[in-house]
């Protein structure tokens, strides 16, 4: 007699385990220019990057003094969306503020 396929043999079937890799992260950079106001940059950092006023001010001063500053670190898709949002806001207000991303 063949074994009943419905009989519980105590074996547990498991799915092969797959390691989930962390997504590659990217720094979103703000670039200094001679026209975009400091107040506008602080506002962008607050609205787009959810920074507090002190943190936004610190980042803005880095951008102003060093020419570039890190607004945040995100996955590629999130970074691209934030860059597009910054560029849209800057264009709407007549500022040439530039934003870019680079691998962390």
UniProtKB/Swiss-Prot annotation:
Biological processes annotated in GO: protein catabolic process; proteolysis
Pfam families, per database record: ClpS
Entry superkingdom: Bacteria
InterPro entries in UniProt: ClpS, ClpS_core, Ribosomal_bL12_C/ClpS-like
Its biological purpose: Involved in the modulation of the specificity of the ClpAP-mediated ATP-dependent protein degradation.
Assembly and interaction partners: Binds to the N-terminal domain of the chaperone ClpA.
NCBIfam families xref list: PRK00033.1-5
The protein's name: ATP-dependent Clp protease adapter protein ClpS
UniProt gene name: clpS
């Amino acid at each position: 007699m063949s074994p009943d396929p419905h009989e519980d043999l105590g074996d547990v079937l498991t799915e092969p385990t797959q390691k989930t890799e962390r997504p590659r992260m990217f720094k979103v950079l703000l670039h200094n220019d001679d026209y975009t106001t400091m107040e506008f940059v602080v506002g962008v950092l607050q609205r787009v990057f959810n920074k507090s006023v002190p943190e936004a001010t610190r980042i803005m001063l880095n951008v102003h003094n060093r020419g570039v500053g890190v607004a945040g670190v995100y996955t590629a898709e999130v970074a691209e969306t934030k860059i597009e949002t910054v560029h849209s806001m800057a264009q709407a207000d007549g500022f040439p503020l530039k934003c870019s991303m680079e691998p962390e």
